[in-house]
Amino acid sequence: MPDRSTKTTMGTEDMHERKVSVEPQDSHQDAQPRGMFHNIKFFVLCHSLLQLTQLMISGYLKSSISTVEKRFGLSSQISGLLAAFNEVGNVSLILFVSYFGSRVHRPRMIGYGALLVATAGLLMALPHFISEPYRYDHSSSDNRSLDFEASLCLPTTMAPASALSNGSCSSHTETKHLTMVGIMFAAQTLLGIGGVPIQPFGISYIDDFAHHSNSPLYIGILFGITTMGPGLAYGLGSLMLRLYVDIDRMPEGGINLTPKDPRWVGAWWLGFLISSGLVVLASSPYFFFPREMPKEKHEFHFRRKVLASAASTASKGEDLSSQHEPLKKQAGLAQIAPDLTLVQFVKVFPRVLLRNLRHPIFLLVVLSQVCTSSMVAGMATFLPKFLERQFSITASFANMLLGCLTIPLVIVGIMMGGVLVKRLHLSPVQCSALCLLGSLLCLLFSVPLFFIGCSTHQIAGITQDLGAQPGPSLFPGCSEPCSCQSDDFNPVCDTSAYVEYTTPCHAGCTGRVVQEALGKSQVFYTNCSCVAGNGTVPAGSCESACSRLVLPFIVLFSLGAGLASITHTPSFMLILRGVKKEDKTLAVGMQFMLLRVLAWMPSPVIHGSAIDTTCVHWALTCGRRAVCRYYDHDLLRNRFIGLQFFFKSGSLVCFTLVLAILRQQSREASTRTTVKSSELQQL
């Protein structure tokens, strides 16, 4: 904050400018216009782009979560923890940032935070560059081989040594794996720390220096542009996952994989590099914005205000004080306690937190938002993977569905909620009724989702129900002479019986041919003793017979998500109108902190753990459980949609209680008013 002499100088210069402005010539400000870095509109543009790119980089991991699992052998529980770990860094520092408010150079702090976010994105991509090339077939000992040897049925005496032992495992291998995972967790923590100052400092800066009538418009534009970030993240993920993971170090001659192959791993790391570059570009203007800029004057009333200020000395003094009033505002939580030290602030905060938590409306609305946010966090993290596994579609197509349908409908829902609150001037009771209606409709749209999906197809030796005909086991008699690796994964499909084998070896195949058709190569395995007919099977998993159901599923799911998002603005208004005026700033800060701690941190882990319980076949790496290769689709659908249904039901119950309490308070207030009126009439 400027000292007294600085304020006096600023006031003298401002009064001089006002005196000059009444002359026939143009004002001094018009004669010497300030640069674009002293224009709050340019700051709004820059901040919109920065928050857009920040959400791109934070949302990109969710778009490639299943790919990262396959590449580094992670369970869904661990990947969910990884996706939620950026909230750890965010929550650990949010109180300190809220305390400091405008006591620091906010634009520069935003710039430094953005550079940390970009650094975190680069760290997320680092494991790709320090790890060995991806091996999609364990039967080859040469990591850089163009065409990995097929895992064929070979007699034990002819099998290579690598096929009979897990010789690639060592303490060095496990240490390297832990290092890769540790780097990604550190990057996610840094991502959360870097994002701490960006939104609160940006909003407070806009509110301080924008005209009071323009501030809501600017913040609305900011959020409108920002909400496109997750959609762009899923779109970027859709594009990047079509490229092979080792596109920068492809073996000569290419690979024999397509994106439909379950072993396919896309270029997950490339999206982090692109997003990081965009964040760096968006952060560069912040180092040129001033700590404080002149208060924006309303465009249509500027000259009238200038003439009025010149007509009266008293008016000058009032205008001058109003001109500098925003400079005295403290952004964040320090606004209500500017004289407290940091230690005193930390001591006061728990008492204010408990006071607000004892407020029934605040508590119930926050709990409903926790339920909704838990649903959204689980959806954003694992819905692409769910679609990929449930309907046997590619990761790229799953991301495209979310980015093109689900995210836009959520944005429309948020906008509709805001428009309804503004246009209809909804009271707290009406806001709670709107929230209740949105939650109820969202819940109803979720019911059909339990019945739309694909059952697990027959997998030899893994699924128990193989139909009327007895199916082969993992080591049937037809493949007993073969030396098959139990941890190898190179699926083939017997299209005549619609049975999938984990490797050609388990199907008893001894030969392999590659056929060229329409510019594409197709791999076939021949002389398969476990396959009827000509004994030939194509490489790859069996195609799902109900993949077309993904469209009605995602439409219903997206409509439900859009209806749930209608509650965003009215529930926020319930908090603002339901707490004491002096607690509003703290209430909003506590709301976001509680949502992070109770929803955005645990929900991805909860959803990931639920998904892991539906796995029927795990890949093993050095004796430890790694990525899941096959799920029980019916169980996966029931548990994933069931979790979503549970959180939606919790939100509905909370909003029902809020509406009941507000109606009771309204009736009591009406009764008191009637009694007072009767007493006055009697007097």
UniProtKB/Swiss-Prot annotation:
Topological domains, Extracellular? 62-80, 133-177, 248-265, 378-397, 450-553, 612-644
Catalytic function, reaction form = dehydroepiandrosterone 3-sulfate(out) = dehydroepiandrosterone 3-sulfate(in); estrone 3-sulfate(out) = estrone 3-sulfate(in); estrone 3-sulfate(out) + hydrogencarbonate(in) = estrone 3-sulfate(in) + hydrogencarbonate(out); taurocholate(out) = taurocholate(in)
Keyword list (alphabetical) reads: Cell membrane, Disulfide bond, Glycoprotein, Ion transport, Membrane, Phosphoprotein, Transmembrane, Transmembrane helix, Transport
The entry's note on the tissues where this protein occurs is:
Expressed in liver, kidney, small intestine mucosa, large intestine, brain, lung, spleen, stomach and heart.
From the UniProt entry, list the residue stretches annotated as the region Disordered: 1-30
Cellular location(s):
Cell membrane; Basal cell membrane; Apical cell membrane
**What S-S linkages are listed for this chain?**
478-509, 484-505, 493-530
Pfam families registered for this protein in UniProt: OATP
One annotated GO molecular function is: organic anion transmembrane transporter activity
> Its GO biological process terms?
cell population proliferation; cellular response to iron ion starvation; heme import into cell; intercellular transport; intracellular iron ion homeostasis; organic anion transport; xenobiotic transport
From which residue to which does the signal peptide run? none
Main subcellular localisation: membrane
Gene3D superfamilies the record matches: MFS general substrate transporter like domains (1.20.1250.20)
Residues passing through the membrane, by range: 42-61, 81-101, 108-132, 178-207, 227-247, 266-290, 356-377, 398-421, 426-449, 554-576, 586-611, 645-662
Question: Phosphoserine is carried by which residues?
Answer: 21, 312, 315
- Tell whether Coiled coil is among the UniProt keywords: no
Q: List residues of the Kazal-like domain.
A: 472-532
Q: Which stretches of this protein does UniProt put in the Cytoplasmic compartment? A: 1-41, 102-107, 208-226, 291-355, 422-425, 577-585, 663-683
User: Knockout: what is the outcome?
Assistant: Knockout mice show no difference in growth rate, viability, fertility, progeny, life span, weight, organs, tissues and serum biochemistry. Knockout females exhibit an increased in Cyp2c65 and Cyp2c66 gene expression, but not males. Knockout mice exhibit a decreased plasma concentration of certain drugs administered orally such as fexofenadine and fluvastatin, whereas no difference were observed after intravenous administration. Also exhibit a decreased in the hepatic uptake of drugs erlotinib and mebrofenin after intravenous injection.
Residues annotated as glycosylated are 143, 166, 527, 534
Record-level GO cellular component terms: apical plasma membrane; basal plasma membrane; plasma membrane
Comment field on protein domains = A conserved histidine residue in the third transmembrane domain (His-128) might play an essential role in the pH sensitivity of SLCO2B1/OATP2B1-mediated substrate transport. Transmembrane domain 1 (TM1) may be localized within the substrate binding pocket.
Family of this protein: Belongs to the organo anion transporter (TC 2.A.60) family.
Q: What else is known?
A: Most likely contributes to the absorption and the disposition of a wide range of drugs in the intestine and the liver.
Functionally, this protein is described as follows: Mediates the Na(+)-independent transport of steroid sulfate conjugates such as estrone 3-sulfate (E1S), dehydroepiandrosterone sulfate (DHEA-S) and pregnenolone sulfate (PregS) and other specific organic anions. Responsible for the transport of E1S through the basal membrane of syncytiotrophoblast, highlighting a potential role in the placental absorption of fetal-derived sulfated steroids including DHEA-S. Also facilitates the uptake of sulfated steroids at the basal/sinusoidal membrane of hepatocytes, therefore accounting for the major part of organic anions clearance of liver.
Supply the name of the protein: Solute carrier organic anion transporter family member 2B1
Organism in which the protein naturally occurs: Mus musculus
Q: Which gene encodes it?
A: Slco2b1
